[in-house]
């Protein structure tokens, strides 16, 4: 099955390398997963862009992947359902680049403190300083969160300070809906 995932990933990489000037320009792959068992497999491709993604862009990517699969001299042994979609609300961020799209939005972040303990914070993403190749692979990459105020605060309370978190300490960051 791993061989199939690698082959399909190559098709997807080929499709995504040729999006300039198309509906899918600026779209990038977040994750690829082949799910199910033989005869009932589904290829799940999550895509995103720095400005958000439209249904038409997902459809374009899906059609191009299907074309690549059909062009192959060595077709996959069975039919595979293809599902191309964007990461939904509540889906953990998987790539550093995704932080840009969530600037100003509420995130629930689980992270490691400098002492190694796990901690959580809910806050608004104020800044994403992503250094390095592919927007954030460097140890210097950080995000800045403004903590969400829980309940009513006393009138004379000091304002909460922004928190800087290195990406290397983030275990999981999930965009949250604000009600």
UniProtKB/Swiss-Prot annotation:
It is found in: Cytoplasm. GO terms for biological process: ribosomal small subunit assembly; translation. The keyword NADP does not apply. Keywords: Cytoplasm, Ribosome biogenesis. Pfam families: RimP_N (PF02576). GO terms for cellular component: cytosol. PANTHER family: RIBOSOME MATURATION FACTOR RIMP. Belongs to the RimP family. Required for maturation of 30S ribosomal subunits. This is Ribosome maturation factor RimP. It comes from Chlorobium chlorochromatii (strain CaD3).
